[in-house]
Amino acid sequence: MHAELSEMELRIVARLNEEIGKDASQLHRASHLVSHYKKHLQVLSQTLDYEDPQNVSCYKTAFQCQQQVCESIDFELEKLAHFEDKLKRKLKECQPVLEGVAEDLDKVRQLQRLQQYLLLVQDIQEISAALGNAINGKDEDKLVNIYLTLYEGNDCEHSVVGRLHAVQAQSLKSFAERTAIYWHKLLLKRLSSAFEAVLKSMRWAHLEQQALNYSSARDTAKAQLLAEYMFLIKSPAEERAPLQSITPSIVCQPINRVVQLLLAPYRQRFQFHFTGTRQTNRLDKPEWFYTQILNWGKETHFFVGKTFQPAAIKAGKLDYNLRLEFIRGLVQLAIEKLAVDIEQIAQDQILFAHLLDETLAFESELRETFGYPASFPSAISVITQPMYLLRWISLEERFCAEKMDDILQAETPFQLIDPNSFENDLKIPKCADQFMRLLDAIKDRYYGLIQPGHQLQFLHLQLELIDSFRQRLVQLHSSGAVPSIPILNAINYLVMVLREWGENVHYLHLHAALAGPNATEINSVFEHAVAELEHWARQLMRNLATKATNEMKAKSMSYRRDAWPTMPEQNSREPFILSPSGGEMFQVLVTLLHNLERELSANLFTQTLRLIAHQIDDFMLESMVMNTKFSAAGAAQFNYDMTRNLFALFGQYTRRPELLFKRTHDACKLLAAARGTALLLLETLRGNQSVEEKTKPLRELHVLSMDSKQCIEVLERRMDIKMF
C-alpha cells in the first residue's frame, strides 16, 4: 500500500491527469510536459535570483515600500494609543459632571415622553372633534378620510392607533381604540342608512328584477362609493372579533357589512315565507326554500359581483370575492332554517330521507351554478352532525338491505341484461348490475361531503353491503336455488367493477385517508372484498370443472376398455378416424364446452377451460395410459384420438391446446415413437447415467413435462417392448 499523498501531491496528480487525460495514446505528451515545466522552473529561478543584477533594483524597491507601510502603521497605532489615554483622562474628569446631570436628563426624557403622550391625546381629541363636526354633514368622503387618520389598521403607521401598536402605553392605546370603535359605529350607521336608501331607490331585492338592468347610473355609482367607504373603515374590534356561530357545530367568518345590507331584504322575505305558521313553511317541502335560495342567487349574483366587486378592490380587499360572499349569506339563511327544523324532521324516516335528497341536490347545484367553495358553510354541515350522520347511515343501510332483497327476490334476478348477445364477452346478470348501481348511488350521495372521515363511514357501509350481497349469493347457491354459472357471472361482474372503482381518484383519496400519510403502498379500498369474491369464484370454477370432467369420465368406460392391446394394424391407405368407443365421451365434452362458453363470461370460461383441461390431462394419463397396454396400432389410434380430436376440440377455444395437456401430449409422443427409438430411450432411462444424460434424449423427443420414472412407466405400456 502506498502512503497517503499530501495535498500538494494530490494537486500535482490532478494537474497531470488534466494535462494528459484518460487516453493511453496521449502518454507521449509526458515528455513534453517534463521539458515544459523544466523551462518554467528555470524562468522562475532566474526571476527569484537575488544576486542577479537585473533583479536587484526590483527587490530593493519592493522592500522599501514594505518598510514604509510598516512605519506608517506603527505611527498610526501610536497615535491611537495616545488618543485612548487622553480620552480616558477626559472621561474621568467629566464623570462627576455626568453623574450630576443624569437625574436632570432622566427628567427631560420623561417630559419628552409626556409631551409625545399629550400630543397623541390631543391628536385623538382633535380627530374626534373633527368627526363630530362632520358626522352630520353631507361629505362622506371627508368623514371617511378623517376616520382613517384615527384608525386604518393595527399595522398602519398613517393612523394614530397604528402608531400606538408597538407602544407600551396600554391606557393610551385603550383610549384610542375605544374612540375609534365609538366613531366606527356612528360612521357605519350613517353609511349604512345612506346605502339602504340607495338600494331602495334601485328597487333592490324586489320581484321586478328587470329593474336591476335599468337602475339609474347615478344610484349605482352612489352605491358603489358607499360600499367602498364601508370596506375602507374598519374597527379595532374586528381584529379580535370571534368567528360567527351559525349552529353550535358550524362557525365561519362574519359577513361583511356591505353584504349584510345586500342580504337584509332577502333575509326579511325568507323569514316571512319560511318561518311561523305560513303555508310555505312545511317540513315536508325543504325544496321550497332551497329553490328560493337558488333562484335569488341566480337572479342577482352576477349583478352583485359586477357592481360591488370594484369597490372592494379599490378599498384594498384584493382577495375578497363579494359575489361568493353574497351567495354564502344566502346559503346561511338555509343553514339557519335547517338547523331549526332538522331535529323534528329526523324523527320521521320519510321526511328525513326526503330532506337528505333535497339537501344533496341543493349542494350539487350550488357548486355547479355558482362555483361555491367546499370550504364555505353548507347545508351538508347540518345533516352531517354526529347524531344525524349516524341516522343517515342507518337509513341508507336499511334501505339498501330492503333493495337487495327486492333485487334477489325478483322474478328473474339472474337473467342477463341482453340474453341474445351471446357474442358478448361479458355476461351481466340483472341482479349484479342493479346492486352495483345501488352502491354507485350511495357514492353519489356522499361524494359531496367535505370531511374524509364522513366519507370513510359511508365507504365502510359500502364494504358491508358488498359482503352482505356475497352472503346472500352464498345462501342462494348453497340451497340449490341458483346454479353455479349465474353466480359466477354475478361475482365476475362485481369484481370487474370493484377493480375499476379501486383505481378511481375518489376511492384513491379515501384509501390515502384510511391508510394515512406513512402508507408505503397504494392499494384499492376494495382489495379485501375483491379477494373474498375471487376466492369463492375460484372454488366455484373448480367445482364446475370437476363436475364437467366427471360427466366426461362417466362416458369413458367403453373407451378405456377398448381393445388397445390387440387393436389390428390400420390400413395405410385408409385415414384414421375417431375411435367408435370414444364417440359418446367426446360428444359429452363437446356439449359441455359449448354450453359453458355460451353461458359464462369469456374470462371465466377461459379459466374454467384450463381447469377442465388439467383434470382431463391427469385422468388420461393416470386412468387411461397407466392402466392400459398399447399395441403399435393401439398407440397410433390413441395418439390420433388425443392430438386430432381432444386437442382439436379445445383448439376451438385456445390457440395452443397441446399446452393444456402437456403430460398426455408427452405420453402420446412416447407411445407413438418408433420401436427402436423407444428401446434406446428405455435403456438410457434405466441405466446409471446422470440426470442430464437421461433428460437429453427426452428433450430431443420434446418430452418436457414428465420425469424419467414416469417416462419409463409409459414406455412399459407398449406391447412391443419386453419387460425385464
UniProtKB/Swiss-Prot annotation:
GO cellular component: Dsl1/NZR complex; endoplasmic reticulum
GO annotation, biological process: cleavage furrow ingression; endoplasmic reticulum to Golgi vesicle-mediated transport; Golgi organization; Golgi vesicle transport; male meiosis cytokinesis; regulation of ER to Golgi vesicle-mediated transport; retrograde vesicle-mediated transport, Golgi to endoplasmic reticulum
Similarity comment: Belongs to the RINT1 family.
PROSITE patterns registered for this protein in UniProt: RINT1_TIP20 (PS51386)
Gene: Rint1
General function of this protein: During cytokinesis in male meiotic cells, required for completion of cleavage furrow ingression possibly in conjunction with Zw10. Required for maintenance of Golgi stack number and morphology. Essential for acroblast assembly.
Chain ranges of the RINT1/TIP20 domain: 163-724
Native source species: Drosophila melanogaster (Fruit fly)
Protein name: RINT1-like protein
UniProt superkingdom: Eukaryota
Entry-linked InterPro entries: EXOC6PINT-1/Sec15/Tip20_C_dom2, RINT1_Tip20
